[in-house]
Amino acid sequence: MAATRSILTLSSIRSKAVIYTFLLMDKPDGGALRQRVRPEHKAYLARVAERMAFAGPLVSDDGHTMLGSLLAIDFESRDAAQTWLANEPFTVAGLYASSSVHAFVNLWPQKAGFAPAD
């Protein structure tokens, strides 16, 4: 009997919420703005904490200079993810020079965060 191979696609997991990744790069010299808006940003993130796989700043090789943010959050749709980003305090304050949002399928076992998709 020939083995059948299952191919995982975004449409095959649509019945579930999807993890969306946010790659958000700061404008040059955005450090002061980032620090000023950070309390609002953290409060906004706390509202989706139960759906968050991970979140944190992107830093330069010195380990301290913040360059942007990388987040992975579970949303029901791309529209919901985009709306969430549009209202995110760093976005509203104009911190980001660029942003991209992508659906993410976790296929690698991990010890924390979201379980891999089947």
Each model region followed by its residue ranges:
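Conserved, structured core segments of small domains
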Residues: A2-D118
